[in-house]
Amino acid sequence: MLAKRIIPCLDVRDGQVVKGVQFRNHEIIGDIVPLAKRYAEEGADELVFYDITASSDGRVVDKSWVSRVAEVIDIPFCVAGGIKSLEDAAKILSFGADKISINSPALADPTLITRLADRFGVQCIVVGIDTWYDAETGKYHVNQYTGDESRTRVTQWETLDWVQEVQKRGAGEIVLNMMNQDGVRNGYDLEQLKKVREVCHIPLIASGGAGTMEHFLEAFRDADVDGALAASVFHKQIINIGELKAYLATQGVEIRIC
């Protein structure tokens, strides 16, 4: 069995790490490189960086910090933000990123997933899915351009359909960003994760809602996700990664202990 992964997420805007609640009202957390270094030293299995306004601004992720991160950490990291071409991806990988993640550009042009996978290998290609539960309809819908609340829009895709579509097109991993839970720290949406797990046959990463160590355990034990991504509990030092992993190990979760 592959070890489960603990993945801090760093949302980047204007060269700073920021964090919002339900993808809104972002506050500045701090500088990118020191935070990345701290998480690597605490025992993170990998890091994910989202340039949250790159797609909505119509630009590729600002690459100036990618090589600086690569110099100070020795764990894999993934970069996302406005990657719309093979050239965009090649540049980011050449600066030292191990994976690239696409979200809004994949919705705009699903063939991009296949072209990236063919060029760089499926192991490099992550698809992020921003999913919102509509209580009125009881359905999960995929959202686009979520980095800018004034431009965020609901797409025609229901989440489970899009999960299956991106797999067919060559995604190597899916990060499921559950927008209703984002930043509120009351637990991952286990019901949604279980539904996605049933149709997702590639690595699945849960994102949105972690507030306690038990929330991570529930995601691994009850929804069988491959990794759990979190931001605010790590940024605000509510949970220490090393202590979290020790706890998970005592609960029988296969985890890499530093």
From Swiss-Prot:
It holds the Pfam family His_biosynth. The keyword Cytoplasm applies. It is found in: Cytoplasm. The active site is at D11, D130. It comes from the Bacteria. It catalyses: 5-[(5-phospho-1-deoxy-D-ribulos-1-ylimino)methylamino]-1-(5-phospho-beta-D-ribosyl)imidazole-4-carboxamide + L-glutamine = D-erythro-1-(imidazol-4-yl)glycerol 3-phosphate + 5-amino-1-(5-phospho-beta-D-ribosyl)imidazole-4-carboxamide + L-glutamate + H(+). GO terms for cellular component: cytoplasm. One of its GO terms (molecular function) is imidazoleglycerol-phosphate synthase activity. GO terms for biological process: L-histidine biosynthetic process. SUPFAM superfamilies: Ribulose-phoshate binding barrel. Its EC number is 4.3.2.10. HAMAP family: HisF. IGPS catalyzes the conversion of PRFAR and glutamine to IGP, AICAR and glutamate. The HisF subunit catalyzes the cyclization activity that produces IGP and AICAR from PRFAR using the ammonia provided by the HisH subunit. NCBIfam families: hisF. This is Imidazole glycerol phosphate synthase subunit HisF. The lineage of its organism: Bacteria, Pseudomonadati, Pseudomonadota, Gammaproteobacteria, Enterobacterales.
